[in-house]
Protein backbone atom coordinates (compact mmCIF):
# COMPACT_ATOMS: atom_id res chain seq x y z
CA UNK A 1 0.00 0.00 0.00
CA UNK A 2 0.97 3.65 0.14
CA UNK A 3 2.64 4.88 3.30
CA UNK A 4 3.47 8.15 5.00
CA UNK A 5 6.36 7.87 7.47
CA UNK A 6 7.00 10.16 10.44
CA UNK A 7 10.56 10.65 11.63
CA UNK A 8 10.42 12.77 14.76
CA UNK A 9 10.58 10.95 18.10
CA UNK A 10 7.72 13.07 19.42
CA UNK A 11 5.47 11.54 16.79
CA UNK A 12 5.62 8.12 18.42
CA UNK A 13 4.97 8.88 22.07
CA UNK A 14 1.74 8.36 24.02
CA UNK A 15 0.16 6.71 20.95
CA UNK A 16 -1.09 3.76 22.97
CA UNK A 17 -3.38 5.90 25.16
CA UNK A 18 -6.34 5.59 22.82
CA UNK A 19 -6.38 1.79 23.12
CA UNK A 20 -8.32 2.16 26.33
CA UNK A 21 -11.48 4.22 26.62
CA UNK A 22 -11.75 7.24 28.86
CA UNK A 23 -14.23 5.40 31.05
CA UNK A 24 -11.71 3.02 32.62
CA UNK A 25 -9.53 5.83 33.85
CA UNK A 26 -11.54 6.54 36.97
CA UNK A 27 -9.86 4.05 39.29
CA UNK A 28 -6.08 4.08 39.04
CA UNK A 29 -5.84 0.91 41.11
CA UNK A 30 -7.17 -1.37 38.36
CA UNK A 31 -4.76 -3.46 36.32
CA UNK A 32 -5.76 -1.89 33.02
CA UNK A 33 -4.88 1.52 34.34
CA UNK A 34 -1.50 0.31 35.48
CA UNK A 35 -1.21 -0.94 31.90
CA UNK A 36 -1.74 2.68 30.88
CA UNK A 37 1.40 3.68 32.77
CA UNK A 38 3.22 0.73 31.23
CA UNK A 39 2.23 1.89 27.75
CA UNK A 40 3.56 5.34 28.53
CA UNK A 41 6.77 3.73 29.73
CA UNK A 42 7.11 1.88 26.41
CA UNK A 43 6.47 5.02 24.38
CA UNK A 44 8.94 7.27 26.19
CA UNK A 45 11.77 4.90 27.09
CA UNK A 46 10.59 5.10 30.67
CA UNK A 47 10.81 8.90 31.02
CA UNK A 48 7.83 11.25 30.67
CA UNK A 49 8.55 14.99 30.59
CA UNK A 50 5.49 17.24 30.55
CA UNK A 51 6.27 20.88 29.80
CA UNK A 52 3.72 23.09 31.57
CA UNK A 53 3.95 26.33 29.60
CA UNK A 54 1.96 29.45 28.78
CA UNK A 55 1.56 33.04 29.98
CA UNK A 56 2.51 34.07 33.52
CA UNK A 57 -0.21 34.06 36.20
CA UNK A 58 -2.42 31.39 34.64
CA UNK A 59 -2.11 28.62 37.24
CA UNK A 60 0.75 26.54 35.82
CA UNK A 61 2.23 25.85 39.26
CA UNK A 62 -1.21 25.00 40.64
CA UNK A 63 -1.72 22.51 37.81
CA UNK A 64 1.64 20.89 38.55
CA UNK A 65 0.92 20.59 42.25
CA UNK A 66 -2.47 18.96 41.65
CA UNK A 67 -1.04 16.64 39.00
CA UNK A 68 1.69 15.48 41.38
CA UNK A 69 -0.80 15.04 44.24
CA UNK A 70 -3.08 12.91 42.08
CA UNK A 71 -0.84 11.03 39.69
CA UNK A 72 2.65 10.73 41.13
CA UNK A 73 3.00 11.07 44.90
CA UNK A 74 0.55 8.27 45.83
CA UNK A 75 2.59 5.78 43.77
CA UNK A 76 6.09 6.63 44.97
CA UNK A 77 7.38 3.75 47.09
CA UNK A 78 10.33 5.45 48.74
CA UNK A 79 9.13 7.54 51.69
CA UNK A 80 12.14 9.86 51.63
CA UNK A 81 11.86 10.47 47.89
CA UNK A 82 8.17 11.21 48.30
CA UNK A 83 8.81 13.73 51.07
CA UNK A 84 11.60 15.36 49.09
CA UNK A 85 9.27 15.66 46.10
CA UNK A 86 6.59 17.27 48.28
CA UNK A 87 9.18 19.81 49.45
CA UNK A 88 10.01 20.61 45.82
CA UNK A 89 6.44 21.35 44.74
CA UNK A 90 6.04 24.89 43.38
CA UNK A 91 4.41 27.70 45.31
CA UNK A 92 1.24 29.29 44.05
CA UNK A 93 -0.83 32.27 45.17
CA UNK A 94 -3.59 34.61 44.04
CA UNK A 95 -2.89 38.07 42.69
CA UNK A 96 -0.79 39.70 40.00
CA UNK A 97 2.68 38.90 41.37
CA UNK A 98 4.74 36.35 39.45
CA UNK A 99 5.61 33.49 41.81
CA UNK A 100 7.83 31.33 39.58
CA UNK A 101 11.21 32.90 38.94
CA UNK A 102 13.01 30.27 36.82
CA UNK A 103 12.38 26.96 35.01
CA UNK A 104 12.13 24.11 37.47
CA UNK A 105 11.95 20.35 37.13
CA UNK A 106 9.28 18.85 39.40
CA UNK A 107 10.64 16.77 41.01
CA UNK A 108 14.31 17.68 40.62
CA UNK A 109 15.13 14.03 39.98
CA UNK A 110 12.45 12.23 37.99
CA UNK A 111 10.02 10.39 40.27
CA UNK A 112 10.14 6.64 39.76
CA UNK A 113 6.83 4.82 39.98
CA UNK A 114 6.71 1.04 40.40
CA UNK A 115 3.93 -0.78 38.56
CA UNK A 116 2.35 -4.13 39.35
CA UNK A 117 4.72 -6.24 37.25
CA UNK A 118 7.90 -4.49 38.46
CA UNK A 119 7.89 -2.17 35.45
CA UNK A 120 9.14 1.27 36.43
CA UNK A 121 8.42 4.62 34.88
CA UNK A 122 10.00 8.00 35.53
CA UNK A 123 7.76 11.07 35.49
CA UNK A 124 8.80 14.69 35.66
CA UNK A 125 6.92 17.93 35.06
CA UNK A 126 8.68 21.10 33.99
CA UNK A 127 7.50 24.41 35.40
CA UNK A 128 8.46 27.71 33.80
CA UNK A 129 7.91 31.40 34.41
CA UNK A 130 5.96 31.84 31.20
CA UNK A 131 5.67 34.68 28.73
CA UNK A 132 4.91 38.09 30.22
CA UNK A 133 1.41 39.60 30.27
CA UNK A 134 0.28 43.18 30.80
CA UNK A 135 -0.59 43.91 34.41
CA UNK A 136 1.56 41.21 36.03
CA UNK A 137 4.02 42.37 38.69
CA UNK A 138 7.30 41.07 40.07
CA UNK A 139 9.44 41.75 37.01
CA UNK A 140 10.32 45.33 37.99
CA UNK A 141 12.24 46.91 40.87
CA UNK A 142 10.83 50.37 41.22
CA UNK A 143 10.89 51.89 37.77
CA UNK A 144 13.69 49.69 36.40
CA UNK A 145 13.87 46.14 35.11
CA UNK A 146 14.54 43.49 37.71
CA UNK A 147 17.91 41.93 36.84
CA UNK A 148 18.56 38.24 37.44
CA UNK A 149 21.35 35.70 37.06
CA UNK A 150 20.68 32.79 34.71
CA UNK A 151 22.55 29.60 33.71
CA UNK A 152 22.75 30.86 30.12
CA UNK A 153 24.82 34.04 30.55
CA UNK A 154 27.74 35.15 32.71
CA UNK A 155 26.02 38.47 33.39
CA UNK A 156 22.66 39.62 34.70
CA UNK A 157 19.77 40.04 32.29
CA UNK A 158 16.27 41.52 32.72
CA UNK A 159 13.74 39.22 34.37
CA UNK A 160 11.38 39.41 31.38
CA UNK A 161 14.12 38.30 28.99
CA UNK A 162 15.13 35.47 31.31
CA UNK A 163 11.52 34.33 31.60
CA UNK A 164 11.14 34.25 27.83
CA UNK A 165 14.40 32.35 27.25
CA UNK A 166 13.61 29.85 29.99
CA UNK A 167 10.12 29.20 28.64
CA UNK A 168 11.44 28.68 25.12
CA UNK A 169 14.04 26.22 26.42
CA UNK A 170 11.40 24.22 28.26
CA UNK A 171 9.35 23.99 25.06
CA UNK A 172 12.22 23.23 22.70
CA UNK A 173 14.81 21.33 24.73
CA UNK A 174 13.19 19.57 27.67
CA UNK A 175 9.52 18.68 27.24
CA UNK A 176 8.32 15.74 25.16
CA UNK A 177 4.73 16.96 25.44
CA UNK A 178 3.35 20.46 25.93
CA UNK A 179 0.46 21.47 28.14
CA UNK A 180 -0.38 25.13 27.56
CA UNK A 181 -2.10 26.62 30.60
CA UNK A 182 -4.07 29.79 29.93
CA UNK A 183 -7.17 31.31 31.54
CA UNK A 184 -10.51 32.94 30.86
CA UNK A 185 -9.59 35.70 33.32
CA UNK A 186 -11.73 34.41 36.19
CA UNK A 187 -8.86 33.11 38.33
CA UNK A 188 -7.31 36.44 39.30
CA UNK A 189 -7.20 40.17 38.81
CA UNK A 190 -6.14 40.25 35.15
CA UNK A 191 -8.68 40.22 32.30
CA UNK A 192 -8.72 37.57 29.59
CA UNK A 193 -7.44 39.93 26.89
CA UNK A 194 -4.16 40.49 28.75
CA UNK A 195 -3.18 36.86 28.20
CA UNK A 196 -3.83 36.59 24.47
CA UNK A 197 -0.43 37.69 23.10
CA UNK A 198 1.56 35.45 25.46
CA UNK A 199 -0.81 32.57 24.75
CA UNK A 200 -0.33 32.98 21.00
CA UNK A 201 3.44 33.10 21.43
CA UNK A 202 3.41 29.83 23.38
CA UNK A 203 1.32 28.03 20.78
CA UNK A 204 3.49 29.37 17.97
CA UNK A 205 6.62 27.97 19.64
CA UNK A 206 5.03 24.53 19.96
CA UNK A 207 3.70 24.57 16.41
CA UNK A 208 7.09 25.52 14.98
CA UNK A 209 8.79 22.42 16.38
CA UNK A 210 5.83 20.10 15.95
CA UNK A 211 5.48 18.90 19.52
CA UNK A 212 2.07 17.53 20.49
CA UNK A 213 0.21 19.78 22.89
CA UNK A 214 -3.20 20.67 24.26
CA UNK A 215 -4.52 23.84 25.89
CA UNK A 216 -5.85 23.85 29.45
CA UNK A 217 -8.22 26.78 30.02
CA UNK A 218 -8.01 27.47 33.75
CA UNK A 219 -11.26 28.86 35.12
CA UNK A 220 -13.16 29.14 38.39
CA UNK A 221 -16.29 28.36 36.34
CA UNK A 222 -15.19 25.81 33.70
CA UNK A 223 -18.76 24.77 32.84
CA UNK A 224 -20.20 28.25 32.35
CA UNK A 225 -21.51 29.28 28.93
CA UNK A 226 -18.92 32.06 28.68
CA UNK A 227 -15.98 29.76 29.43
CA UNK A 228 -17.26 27.09 27.05
CA UNK A 229 -17.63 29.76 24.37
CA UNK A 230 -14.03 30.91 24.91
CA UNK A 231 -12.81 27.31 24.75
CA UNK A 232 -14.64 26.74 21.47
CA UNK A 233 -13.11 29.90 20.04
CA UNK A 234 -9.62 28.81 21.05
CA UNK A 235 -10.24 25.35 19.59
CA UNK A 236 -11.10 26.93 16.27
CA UNK A 237 -8.20 29.37 16.47
CA UNK A 238 -5.44 26.91 17.37
CA UNK A 239 -6.92 23.74 15.85
CA UNK A 240 -6.12 21.73 18.95
CA UNK A 241 -7.96 20.41 21.98
CA UNK A 242 -8.89 23.06 24.57
CA UNK A 243 -10.09 21.78 27.94
CA UNK A 244 -11.74 24.09 30.50
CA UNK A 245 -10.82 22.98 34.03
CA UNK A 246 -10.40 24.47 37.49
CA UNK A 247 -6.72 23.78 38.21
CA UNK A 248 -7.23 24.22 41.95
CA UNK A 249 -9.88 21.49 41.90
CA UNK A 250 -8.27 19.28 39.25
CA UNK A 251 -9.57 15.70 39.42
CA UNK A 252 -8.01 12.45 38.32
CA UNK A 253 -10.44 12.01 35.44
CA UNK A 254 -9.59 15.57 34.29
CA UNK A 255 -5.93 14.57 34.06
CA UNK A 256 -6.70 11.40 32.13
CA UNK A 257 -8.92 13.32 29.74
CA UNK A 258 -6.13 15.84 29.14
CA UNK A 259 -3.64 13.05 28.41
CA UNK A 260 -6.16 11.30 26.19
CA UNK A 261 -6.65 14.46 24.16
CA UNK A 262 -2.88 14.83 23.79
CA UNK A 263 -2.88 11.46 22.06
CA UNK A 264 -5.09 12.80 19.29
CA UNK A 265 -2.52 15.53 18.61
CA UNK A 266 0.23 13.07 17.66
CA UNK A 267 0.90 12.70 13.94
CA UNK A 268 -0.11 9.56 12.09
CA UNK A 269 3.05 7.61 11.38
CA UNK A 270 1.81 5.39 8.56
CA UNK A 271 -1.24 4.61 6.43
CA UNK A 272 -1.79 1.36 4.56
CA UNK A 273 -4.23 1.12 1.66
CA UNK A 274 -5.60 -2.24 0.52
CA UNK A 275 -7.19 -2.64 -2.92
CA UNK A 276 -8.46 -5.72 -4.81
CA UNK A 277 -5.52 -7.81 -5.98
CA UNK A 278 -6.58 -7.80 -9.60
CA UNK A 279 -6.40 -3.99 -9.77
CA UNK A 280 -2.68 -4.19 -9.05
CA UNK A 281 -2.27 -5.74 -12.52
CA UNK A 282 -3.74 -2.68 -14.22
CA UNK A 283 -1.34 -0.15 -15.77
CA UNK A 284 -0.87 3.08 -13.77
CA UNK A 285 -2.69 5.15 -16.40
CA UNK A 286 -5.81 2.97 -16.36
CA UNK A 287 -8.78 5.17 -15.28
CA UNK A 288 -9.73 2.85 -12.43
CA UNK A 289 -6.22 2.56 -11.00
CA UNK A 290 -5.57 6.26 -11.51
CA UNK A 291 -8.72 7.06 -9.52
CA UNK A 292 -7.69 4.75 -6.68
CA UNK A 293 -4.25 6.35 -6.54
CA UNK A 294 -5.77 9.83 -6.55
CA UNK A 295 -8.14 8.84 -3.73
CA UNK A 296 -5.16 7.67 -1.68
CA UNK A 297 -3.35 10.94 -2.32
CA UNK A 298 -6.41 12.95 -1.31
CA UNK A 299 -6.78 11.03 1.95
CA UNK A 300 -3.08 11.34 2.75
CA UNK A 301 -3.26 15.06 2.07
CA UNK A 302 -5.81 15.51 4.87
CA UNK A 303 -4.27 13.07 7.32
CA UNK A 304 -1.72 14.70 9.59
CA UNK A 305 -2.69 13.96 13.19
CA UNK A 306 -4.48 11.06 14.85
CA UNK A 307 -7.61 13.17 15.25
CA UNK A 308 -7.74 13.64 11.47
CA UNK A 309 -8.46 9.92 11.03
CA UNK A 310 -11.85 10.33 12.64
CA UNK A 311 -12.68 13.53 10.78
CA UNK A 312 -11.76 12.10 7.37
CA UNK A 313 -14.42 11.63 4.70
CA UNK A 314 -14.00 8.17 3.15
CA UNK A 315 -16.71 8.69 0.53
CA UNK A 316 -16.01 6.32 -2.40
CA UNK A 317 -15.27 7.59 -5.90
CA UNK A 318 -16.78 6.52 -9.24
CA UNK A 319 -15.00 3.16 -9.57
CA UNK A 320 -14.86 2.38 -5.86
CA UNK A 321 -18.11 1.10 -4.39
CA UNK A 322 -17.01 1.13 -0.76
CA UNK A 323 -14.11 2.34 1.38
CA UNK A 324 -13.78 0.89 4.85
CA UNK A 325 -11.56 1.99 7.72
CA UNK A 326 -10.57 -1.43 9.04
CA UNK A 327 -8.09 -0.71 11.79
CA UNK A 328 -6.40 2.11 13.65
CA UNK A 329 -3.43 0.42 15.26
CA UNK A 330 -2.20 2.66 18.04
CA UNK A 331 -0.27 0.03 19.93
CA UNK A 332 3.02 0.65 18.18
CA UNK A 333 3.52 3.55 15.78
CA UNK A 334 -0.05 4.60 15.01
CA UNK A 335 -1.06 3.46 11.58
CA UNK A 336 -4.32 3.01 9.72
CA UNK A 337 -5.70 0.26 7.48
CA UNK A 338 -8.07 1.47 4.77
CA UNK A 339 -9.62 -1.06 2.39
CA UNK A 340 -11.26 -0.20 -0.93
CA UNK A 341 -13.81 -2.46 -2.61
Predicted feature descriptions by range:
Residues 7-25:
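Short, Lys/Arg-enriched N-terminal segments with co-localized hydrophobic residues
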Residues 220-277:
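Canonical P-loop GTPase G-domain recognition
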Residues 139-157:
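A solvent-exposed, charged loop/short amphipathic helix patch at secondary-structure junctions
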Residues 70, 131-132, 205, 209, ...:
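Conserved, well-folded catalytic cores of nucleic-acid-processing
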Residues 31-143:
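Conserved G1/Walker A P-loop phosphate-binding module
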Residues 28, 44, 48-50, 57, ...:
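P-loop NTP-binding site
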Amino acid sequence: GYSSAASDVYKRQFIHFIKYGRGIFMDISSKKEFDLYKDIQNRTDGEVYLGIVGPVRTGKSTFIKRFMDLMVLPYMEDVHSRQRTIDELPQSAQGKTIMTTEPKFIPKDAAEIALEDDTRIKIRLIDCVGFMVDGATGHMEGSTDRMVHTPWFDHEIPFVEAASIGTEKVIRDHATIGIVVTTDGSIGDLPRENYVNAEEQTVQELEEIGKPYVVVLNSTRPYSEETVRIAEGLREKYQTAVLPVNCEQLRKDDVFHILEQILYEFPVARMEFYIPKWTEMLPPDHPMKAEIIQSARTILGGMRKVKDIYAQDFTPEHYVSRMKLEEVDLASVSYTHLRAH
